[in-house]
Amino acid sequence: MIIVYNKDLTNFKEISHALSIQMEEHYNAIGKAIITLPIDDYNISAIENGGIVYDTIRDMSFVIRNHKYDTARTTVTVNAYTCNRLLNKRAIIQKNTISNIESGVRYVIESNLRGLPNVEIGGLNGFTDTTEAILYGGQVLDEIMPMLETAKIGNRMRWDADRRVHVFELYKGRDLTEGIHSVVFSEEYKTAKDLVIANDDSVFKNVVYVQGTLNDDSETEIVVEVGTAIGDERFEKWLDRSFKQDKEETESQFRKRLKQIGLEEIARLVNRHTFAVSIDTKEYGTTYKLGDVVSCVSQRFGVELKSRITSVKYTLDISGEKINLILGEPILTALGEVKLIG
């Protein structure tokens, strides 16, 4: 069932006759939804920018960013984004030195909410992943996601329908590669319908040189090398973004920060092995869900690996409903490749 709340969350309406629905969530990114409805007084009154779309079955929630009335087709099209994007309504206005990623991210969010309504932060999981990073400036979600990517930590904004609040959470999913609850997506086992396998190394880099400037009289330039690959398997990138040592940083701390920047860059520029499959709509959310690590096997193509479910896409149209999963890093489009490598 799809429910649409008004902007101030005081009222909601059920949407039961959508012409088409596309909803997608990602493990550590902003997802989106596109919903097409017939134009009638009920739907017109239900839709407003800033309202919340909630799928009660798949536990997905989105904030409406825009909508369009088309009188020729007699439709209204709603465009929405996953509610973690609400954090980008706030900027990081004070310098934050991060060591433990989970507690550091929590502190950055808490100290920058500044009255953002109906948003809470979930409890700590006890993750021990560490970093050497300084967050200052930029939008909150955009700035924390690279650190989460390096540590393979997901983020989501869970909708608490009883209290009508958004709860921001960090999570890692379950390891479902072994034991009685193991999950295997395999063409041979008939558990990988519409299988697409992709291997993309177009942006792959495993060694990064990060240039920075010391805070001394001569403004000495330094370069920190991150990565240990050698020979033909070494793929290098030069990263110069005017990184400067802060007044309160020692040179050792600055070098550690540059190293962390290099690690985050390597985490983005990966060799992308991807399984894309269609699944039984009844299995998602019970047998496995976003963030879980599962096995992917294709004897015919010689592929066997453990992959995280990084994206889920639900589609409803005239042909019926289906769910597609992306396991592993999604393959880039040409535009995505340009954005990633700069």
Describe the role of every protein-language-model region:
Residues 1-16, 178:
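Polar/acidic, low-complexity leader/linker segments enriched in S/T/G and N/D
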Residues 68-87, 123-205:
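Short beta-strand-centered interaction patches in the first periplasmic/extracellular domains
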